[in-house]
Amino acid sequence: MPKRSDINHVLVIGSGPIVIGQAAEFDYSGTQACRVLKEEGLRVTLINSNPATIMTDPEMADHTYVEPIEPEYIEKIFQKEIEQGHPIDTVLATLGGQTALNAAIQLDRLGILEKYNVELIGADIDAIERGEDRQKFKDIVATIGGESARSAVCHNMDEVYATVEELGLPVVVRPSFTMGGLGSGLAYTMEDLDRIAGGGLAASPEANVLIEESILGWKEYELELMRDGDDNVVVICSIENVDALGVHTGDSVTVAPAMTLTDREYQIMRDQGIAIIREVGVDTGGCNIQFAVNPEDGRIITIEMNPRVSRSSALASKATGFPIAKLAAKLAIGYTLDEVTNDITGVTPAAFEPTLDYVVVKAPRFAFEKFPGADDTLTTTMKSVGEVMSLGRNYIAALNKALRSLETKQLGFWTKPDEYFAGERATDLQAVLEDLRRPTEGRLYDVELAMRLGATIEELYDASSIDPWFLAELKALVDFREKLEDAPVLDEALLREAKFMGLSDLQIAAVRPELAGEDGVRRLRHSLGIRPVFKTVDTCAAEFEAKTPYHYSAYELDPAAESEVAPQTEREKVLILGSGPNRIGQGIEFDYSCVHAALELSRVGYETVMVNCNPETVSTDYDTADRLYFEPLTFEDVMEVYHAESESGTVAGVIVQLGGQTPLGLAERLKAAGVPIIGTSPEAINMAEDRGEFGDLLGRAQLPAPAFGTAHSFEQARAVANEIGYPVLVRPSYVLGGRGMEIVYDEASLEDYIQRATELSTEHPVLVDRFLDNAIEIDVDALCDGEEVYLAGVMEHIEEAGVHSGDSACALPPMTLGAQDIEKVRQSTRALALGIGVKGLMNVQYALKDDILYVIEANPRASRTAPFVSKATGVHLAKAASRIAVGATIADLRAEGMIPTGYDGGSLPLDAPIAVKEAVLPFNRFRRPDGRSLDTLLSPEMKSTGEVMGLADNFGAAYAKAETGAFGTLPTEGTVFVSVANRDKRSVILAIQRLDSMGFNILATEGTAGMLRRNGIDCEVVLKSSDVREGVEGRSIVDRIRDGEVDLILNTPAGSAGARHDGYEIRGSAVTVGVPLVTTVQGVTAAVQGIEALRRGELTVRALQELDHAVKA
């Protein structure tokens, strides 16, 4: 069945900002889809609000709209494309995660698809609803002879109580049409039930929840399937969760293929999966289905399905080499599986199911340290912010590799022995077993500790519900440790066995201290000729030859085993080190820069080699770089890749400046080991990080910086703070994403900080800086080739200094800076770039106060804002930086047209659009152990997971779009609640007067209301929670927010403890109900401008391709 001839113009709906539960995997799937559809000669239009994605690059589609993924904007795109003579005839919504599916359902319900005669391809509305609606899906499972957990769909709390009476506690609560388990949970008590089911009803767009019998402790599996228009179905991959049911699959360590299924169980699941995909009606494309197996009696239950490409699809795709998203796009336009060739072999059709001759392990990356007070129990609501994948010849080797890929404090078993075995816990087996009953991030380390304290597999299974097979694998590792420890000498056979089990040199050194650390183990290993061989992912267990070089390392027991790395060409090679797992502070933006470097260097004649371990990203797609290594980003693993590449050709150098802090942290050791680092040198990177050297540079260049001092103890910190004056900003040195940073207003808070934060880093001191209150913060991206500096973009933060730049909204071009300010920025940036010795990208943060431009920090690397600046100005910064690294000058790039002539990012043409970047925060995912919300205040510590961009001709419209994209659509009428700290009251009067004149009802607390009334603003006084607690009659503001009576909240934090508690409750209830919340004075002003733009109805849509012409005209 060839391609359909009635499809000419496809709208691909992207997934929007990175949030927990929906991350970079959808950029990867959407990018593949856009490429395929364009290759097939179709016109492609894309909507996605996230600028940090490859899919929103102008080359990926004919028209790219960086707009909020909402029906009104999609309808504007339909209208605009008709006006331009290119009507859209089909929409592909199965590759943009839950966001795209929910948008498609709304388009259908509002009649927009019918109005414009547009068809949904991949999965129609009925199939989406049958897969996503809990009751419909349950009926389908029954139809095909499968079994679901006993459950009922409830629309209100009365129905919930009735169901629980029948099923008994505990129960699982799951809302419909949400992703990443948002709003779901386990209810053990009636209090739990009220909290979780109430929240679940609020989280579900359909206002219904499924209450299900608890199948906690069962084994959980997933099957990834594809179906074409001829009803051919293939099963691509089985995935098994190491954690038992009760931990969200996104938070569990998972393994592919499934390890503990019997053949009979696998066949039952396979048959049911195929019957379900047919019955649901996913006509074309991928889906994943989750099953549970009762370990006691083998009863199999179908849990749920995603009728779309999902997080698991990205994992299955990278694990097998089978390009699921690419095929889903081909099948959606009419091809069948037997008509599409598998890219990796070049000869087999996609109808051949992949076979694996290796084991894949995925491990989640968490960020609980960013949310003090959050409950770190792993439940059915997903909490991890990223993940890694590793490939090995056996399960334990793949697991060891995955754990060290995570880049947490503990790089695998035994690598943090001092901290880990501190205190009584190290010897108290019962305490460890008790801890294992509550799943947390470190549970595998707890299992290993319990084994060394003598726990049996039966005891551990009882405590953790982890299948005995996985426990036995870990027991073999613990037994091997004893053998390794007790051997009188570490000979070749024993060292080979250790490496075969996936142990790193660092882990071996921890057990054999006489080898003098990791370097000593490496020297011994090399002297014995023990190196990894590199195997190939080929989808067919070596039955056919692979055409795409996609490698992983393995140590074989046989010394004669051969590597499969063959030189592709005679070209010089450049290694690009990726950014590892997504985490807060280091996300998809860095992957974006790595991908651009790979594509650009390939284009100009280099052979590009990507090293990364993140399965969600475009950088680990098999056709992004010329060669891909799926390896941990540790010194040992990178050195072995470099050695293998050097053996098969000439390596021009390694690029470390694009992947964030991860590769930067390796730069010095790599250079010392003889690896050529191209671009900015490790010495220059260190100079920018070292406060003393950097301070000297500022002195020489006569650039002002806030006064600062360094301290190794509380006494020293107190002396520094007294000298430079409070408030001060305190932080450890060498951090990304503002880890452990705080603004401190007095000595007591300083002492509290030092006690909490000095454990962050023993060898690095704490830095104490003068904090510039109420300054304007400015973010700058620039390129430097060693001689010339190009100012790429000047962004003005909307929040004042003190909010981490990754969490602050910002505008480009800047809104309140004059020509003189920008000239100061340009000259200061030039002095810094040349003084540091930057070759490539640099990011500088400034604060402007009383007409003095202070340098806050300079980072000689690709920044978080590089993709945003690239989209807003039409200049591909990462491509330019990669060319500078291999010797091009800015003049060369100007001559090629990559960098504009006649202006820079500080002097954009007058008709250039205004771009606003807004951060997306994950507070709805985290709760305190008692179930209360976390405080949502912004601080110098970064908390956002992703970002969106708003583009328009004026600031108000751009800001309004950015807020809509970040899930905080501003209201155009209704009720506004105002409660601001005393120091902010004068600053907000004008903004509130404008809201009053637009007809909003104003609610205010007593103190704020008095000030508003004195300024002629009519408002209603509302009670604070503390008033009601003290016995005042009436409903508090928190009650009114929870009852849906408030449309916008303006609340800046106050100083006293009582006021702080009231503010915390107000902000927490805003997150629970989903009311837009503004917590800074500048944010209030911006919000009012946004509301005015919305009321004027000025929101138009323009494709990036048109804007590029406007910027470059």
Swiss-Prot record:
Cofactor binding summary note: Binds 4 Mg(2+) or Mn(2+) ions per subunit.
Q: Where is this region: Allosteric domain?
A: 968-1113
Q: Which GO terms describe its biological process?
A: 'de novo' UMP biosynthetic process; glutamine metabolic process; L-arginine biosynthetic process
Q: What residues does Mn(2+) 3 bind to?
A: Q845, E857
Q: Which cofactor does it need?
A: Mg(2+); Mn(2+)
Sites where the protein binds ATP 2 = R731, R770, L772, E777, G802, V803, H804, S805, Q845, E857
**Cited Gene3D superfamilies:** 3.40.50.20, ATP-grasp fold, A domain, ATP-grasp fold, B domain, Carbamoyl-phosphate synthetase, large subunit oligomerisation domain, Methylglyoxal synthase-like domain
Pfam families reported in the protein's UniProt record: CPSase_L_D2, CPSase_L_D3, MGS
Q: Which GO terms describe its molecular function?
A: ATP binding; carbamoyl-phosphate synthase (ammonia) activity; carbamoyl-phosphate synthase (glutamine-hydrolyzing) activity; metal ion binding
Q: Which keywords does this chain's UniProt record carry?
A: Amino-acid biosynthesis, Arginine biosynthesis, ATP-binding, Ligase, Magnesium, Manganese, Metal-binding, Nucleotide-binding, Pyrimidine biosynthesis, Repeat
- Which stretches does the entry tag as region Oligomerization domain? 408-565
Binding residues for Mn(2+) 1: Q290, E304
The residues the record assigns to binding ATP 1 are: R134, R174, G180, G181, E213, I215, E220, G246, V247, H248, Q290, E304
Its biological purpose is as follows: Large subunit of the glutamine-dependent carbamoyl phosphate synthetase (CPSase). CPSase catalyzes the formation of carbamoyl phosphate from the ammonia moiety of glutamine, carbonate, and phosphate donated by ATP, constituting the first step of 2 biosynthetic pathways, one leading to arginine and/or urea and the other to pyrimidine nucleotides.
Record family assignment: Belongs to the CarB family.
- How does this polypeptide assemble, per the annotation? Composed of two chains; the small (or glutamine) chain promotes the hydrolysis of glutamine to ammonia, which is used by the large (or ammonia) chain to synthesize carbamoyl phosphate. Tetramer of heterodimers (alpha,beta)4.
Put simply, this protein is called Carbamoyl phosphate synthase large chain
